[in-house]
Curated annotation (Swiss-Prot):
Substrates-to-products reaction catalysed: ATP + H2O + cellular proteinSide 1 = ADP + phosphate + cellular proteinSide 2
Record field: transmembrane: none
Superkingdom of the source species: Bacteria
BP GO terms, sorted: intracellular protein transmembrane transport; protein import; protein targeting; protein transport by the Sec complex
Function per UniProt: Part of the Sec protein translocase complex. Interacts with the SecYEG preprotein conducting channel. Has a central role in coupling the hydrolysis of ATP to the transfer of proteins into and across the cell membrane, serving both as a receptor for the preprotein-SecB complex and as an ATP-driven molecular motor driving the stepwise translocation of polypeptide chains across the membrane.
Residues at which ATP binds: 89, 107-111, 502
UniProt protein name: Protein translocase subunit SecA
EC number: 7.4.2.8
SUPFAM superfamilies: Helical scaffold and wing domains of SecA, P-loop containing nucleoside triphosphate hydrolases, Pre-protein crosslinking domain of SecA
Record localization: Cell inner membrane; Cytoplasm
Top EC class for this record: translocase
Organism taxonomic ancestry: Bacteria, Pseudomonadati, Pseudomonadota, Alphaproteobacteria, Hyphomicrobiales
Subunit structure: Monomer and homodimer. Part of the essential Sec protein translocation apparatus which comprises SecA, SecYEG and auxiliary proteins SecDF-YajC and YidC.
Keyword entries, A-Z: ATP-binding, Cell inner membrane, Cell membrane, Cytoplasm, Membrane, Metal-binding, Nucleotide-binding, Protein transport, Translocase, Translocation, Transport, Zinc
Length: 910
């Protein structure tokens, strides 16, 4: 029976169909220009860029230029790459230009699609960012598609890990910049820790196209980018508490796998209190007394570490370190650490060295970073299941782009077995049958542990020729994925490992040529070998096609339908045949957590025998329902987190904008004077209550605070004794004395140095207080949830108290800046004052596809100081040119040749 909605769609078409249909007139207009474009010489075609820029200068909008610009970019791609964008790719390009998400199936050429809106938007000269999930793809695409942009006269840059600030500035200044989401986010944070505008590398957030947009804006939305600095060592505390958790019995705690929460029962709490008391760690009578907040935090983390986190599923131990496993991709994420002390609890559990906790210096979520862009768009193979989230959070509409050729892949119903053992028997049998007839098989698993269990089983069953693609073997990832389409190939992969590399039937000719002929010089012999490889790949492709194309065999359902769809989507690219099937058991995580008991009873009643499967569309529907529930819950979590993060994000934007204004400002004397007046108002109001008699004034307190904040010794006692003296008189006299002292200091320093000193003091003080404020907000957020028990809305409470904390921070800023500037002295005026140094920083910087930290050594490494602080060898320093000195140690001989230590010569600035 057709639903009313289905009937309406048949008559009127869906909103998606209408959006696609609305682009057709422009597609036809672009096609109508094709012969005209082909008739142009290379010089004439490239010259159109300058003409378009002139049109924009004369008032034309980018929409006005869409048809001719797309026609130009299409012809350039045909000439330079030998690739002509199809009509459906033009539609995808228009969706991206309009600030939407284009859902395009695997193999439909998303990389090429992006060139069309990138070219059009780059004409405005404000920069376009193409965002990918790892350095490999950013570099590959910038070189590959960069040929089109360069042919058309545009500059292209790429941001990858390890570049200097100068190289980053050049890349960001390009018309088109390819970069990873992590590099963009960290450059934004680092820019907002700089002390001079010229040191910043980014030039604004105009337009971004995010590749694999679901991975970046949904899967990674909850994981903030964090720059942090080290805190005190608490390893002994973690180890002690870990020994207590081991002593607990199942009745001492309750675990909820579905919600991923754990709590202590009354018996457990009592047992813990006794253990903590014996270890002299408990203050007061109860574990939940206010002075034991930190201890509660530690014991909760230790319980989670032991009961909610499994080794080889959620993390592995490698080289004496806990390495997190990405739940979506099954990849290792070296360098990424759980926050709030959970990682340290896992280290204590596994008896490896406990790394110190870090204090957050700056952080931003991808949700908030990408909302900085004036226009944002994205592409992926799977976005429709998250359409509501993209719409609600980012204001992005998802449009499903039709495929160039119809998808003929056969998606078969799930096979459900009672036990994991029965399921694996069926999987091995299925793999054997597919391999025997020469059908390439991609076997999808949800974790490293399961991929290796299956690999062991295949070995025992006599399989020799198969590949395992999981976090342990990421180095060969692209190569394994590229050859997974060979006839009879068996590839076991965790979830979406290798995303970004197509599985081509017969194998990937380009990668084979690079691999087999890497060192062979150009010439007739190499050309002959290349032709042989291409012919061999074609032959193998025909064989794989005859066997039915790629068979995607999934061993488990993921919590998210989108991840399942991504796995299915590896098969049936560009009209190729293929098939997909999920093999499940009632002992799988999703089935177990979401009510498999009822189904088990039902299957027993139906008389299901051992090794028999149940296959029915109803089962698929029931599973989809369970997945929708999980997705809805995860969306609610992300939405709720965003509401809280928006509070700190609004404050972050205010602070970062203020920093830029301070760096841009020629003179800050007026701002400093206002701060000073604010401090004077506060200390006078505190000492002299409204309508109070002179005898009631706190004269001693006022004198002490004038000395503390203004560095002035004023006869406040004598003033207070004067007949008829009022509060305003006291305030005016203090202000006059403070202004006179500030003016005298400014004249001694000179305007240039004074401006530098003021800017440095304000920026450094603001940064220090902002870091403390971030910690305070984190603490507030961790406790505000309990207000719900008092029938108060935790979010409103958080907003109110966060605002109060922010106001208090600004008050502290006024006081600290005033106190410092009223004391600062010039020991020796440097010829060129060195910029302040940033604090020691650690960056958690994870590649979204490989799940690895891009810092060298695979560890969370000390962030490299900016290039103006780089160490320069003494022999390379010119005594007469300070720009060549780099970073000089304070106790080194001054490079100017005076013979004094640097700190007593050019570095003598306090």
């Amino acid at each position: 029976m057709v639903s009313l909605g289905g009937l309406a769609r048949k008559v009127f078409g869906s909103s998606n169909d209408r959006r696609v249909k609305s682009t057709r007139p422009r597609v036809e207009a672009i096609n109508a220009m094709e012969n005209e474009m082909r008739a142009l010489s290379d010089t004439e075609l490239a010259g159109r860029t300058e003409k378009f820029r002139q049109d924009i200068a004369n008032g034309a909008s980018l929409d006005d230029l869409l048809v001719p610009a797309f026609a130009t970019a299409r012809e350039a791609a045909r000439r330079v790459l030998g690739m002509r964008p199809f009509d459906v790719q033009l539609i995808g390009g228009m969706v991206l230009h309009n600030g939407g998400i284009a859902e395009m199936r695997t193999g439909e050429g998303k990389t090429l699609v992006a060139t069309l809106p990138v070219y059009l938007n780059a004409l405005a000269g404000k920069g376009v960012h193409v965002v990918t999930v790892n350095d490999y793809l950013a570099t590959r695409d910038s070189e590959w598609m960069g040929r089109v942009y360069k042919f058309l006269g545009l500059s292209v840059g790429v941001i990858v890990h390890g570049l200097s600030d100068e190289e980053r500035r050049v890349a960001y200044a390009s018309d088109v910049t390819y970069a990873t989401n992590n590099e963009l986010g960290f450059d934004y944070l680092r820019d907002n820790m700089k002390y001079e505008r010229a040191q910043m590398v980014q030039r604004g957030h105009n337009y971004a196209i995010v590749d694999e947009v679901d991975s970046i804006l949904v899967d990674e939305a909850r994981t903030p980018l964090i720059i942090s600095g080290p805190l005190e060592d608490r390893s002994e505390m973690y180890n002690t508490i870990d020994t207590f958790i081991i002593q607990l019995q199942p009745q001492d705690y309750e675990i909820d796998e579905k919600q991923k929460t754990s709590i202590f029962t009354e018996e457990g709490t009592e047992k813990l209190e006794n253990l903590l008391r014996d270890a002299d760690l408990l203050k007061g009578e109860s574990l939940y007394d206010v002075e034991n907040v930190a201890i509660v935090h530690h014991v909760n983390n230790a319980l989670k570490a032991h009961r909610l986190f499994q080794k080889d599923k959620d993390y592995i131990v490698r080289n004496g370190e806990i390495v997190i496993i990405d739940e979506f991709t099954g990849r290792m994420m070296p360098g990424r650490r759980y926050s709030e002390g959970l990682h340290q609890a896992l280290e204590a559990k596994e008896h490896v060295a406990i790394q110190p906790e870090n204090q957050t210096l700056a952080s931003v979520t991808f949700q908030n970073y990408f909302r900085l862009y004036k226009k944002l768009s994205g592409m992926t193979g799977t976005a429709l299941t998250e359409a509501e989230e993209f719409g609600n959070i980012y204001g992005l509409e998802v449009t499903e782009i039709p495929t160039n050729l119809p998808v003929i892949r056969k998606d078969e119903d799930d096979e459900v077995y009672r036990t994991v053992e029965e399921k694996y028997k069926a999987i091995v049998k299925e793999i054997r049958e597919a391999s025997a007839k020469g059908q390439p098989t991609l076997v999808g698993t949800t974790s490293i542990e399961k991929s290796e269990q299956l690999a062991d089983r295949l070995r025992k069953e006599g399989f020799k020729d198969f590949e395992v693609l999981n976090a342990r073997h990421h180095e060969r990832e692209a190569a394994i994925v590229a050859q997974a389409g060979k006839p009879g190939a068996i590839t076991i992969a965790t979830n979406m490992a290798g995303r970004g590399t197509d599985i081509k039937l017969g194998g990937n000719a380009e990668m084979r040529i690079a691999d087999e002929l890497g060192d062979m010089p150009e010439g007739p012999e190499r050309e002959a070998r290349e032709k042989e490889i291409i012919a061999d790949v074609e032959r193998l492709k025909e064989k794989a096609l005859a066997a039915g194309g790629l068979y995607v065999l999934a061993t488990e359902r993921h919590e998210s339908r989108r991840i399942d769809n991504q796995l299915r989507g590896r098969s049936g690219r560009q009209g190729d045949p293929g098939r997909s099937k999920f093999f499940l058991s009632l002992q799988d995580d999703l089935m177990r957590i979401f009510g498999s008991e009822r189904m088990d009873g039902m299957l027993q009643k139906l008389g299901l025998k051992e090794d028999e499967a149940i296959i029915h569309p109803w089962i698929n529907k029931a599973l989809e329902k369970a997945q929708k529930k999980v997705e809805a819950r995860n969306f609610d979590i992300r939405k709720n987190l965003l509401k809280y993060d928006d509070v700190s994000n609004d404050q972050r934007k205010v602070v970062f904008e203020q920093r830029i204004e301070l760096m841009d400002g020629e003179g800050l004397s007026e701002t400093i004077a206002e701060m000073r007046e604010g401090v004077i108002d506060e200390i006078v109001a505190k000492a002299i209550p409204e309508n109070a008699y002179a005898e009631q004034w706190d004269v001693a307190g006022l004198k002490a605070e004038v000395a503390e904040f203004l560095n002035l010794d004023l006869p406040v006692e004598d003033w207070a004794k004067e007949e008829g003296i009022a509060e305003d008189d006291i305030r005016e006299r203090i202000t006059q004395a403070a202004d006179a002292a500030a003016k005298e200091r400014a004249e001694r320093f000179g305007p240039e140095v004074m401006n530098y000193v003021e800017r440095s003091v304000v920026l450094q003080t603001l940064d220090h207080l902002w870091r403390e404020h971030i910690v305070n907000l984190d603490h507030l957020r961790s406790v505000v949830g309990f207000r719900g028990y008092a029938q108060r809305d935790p979010l409103q409470e958080y907003k109110g108290e966060a605002f109060e904390l922010f106001q208090a921070m600004l008050g502290n800023l006024r006081q600290a800046v005033t106190a410092q500037l009223m004391r600062v002295e010039l020991v020796r005026q440097a010829a060129e004052a060195p910029p302040p140094e940033a604090p020691d920083m650690f960056g958690t910087h994870i590649d979204g596809t490989t799940g690895e930290n891009d810092f060298e050594g695979g560890e969370t490494a000390l962030l490299v100081r900016q290039e103006q602080n780089a160490v320069v060898a003494p022999e390379d320093r010119d005594p007469n040119n300070q720009a060549t000195w780099g970073k000089v140690g304070r106790n080194e001989a001054c490079p100017c040749g005076s013979g004094k230590k640097y700190k007593h010569c050019h570095g003598a600035f306090a």
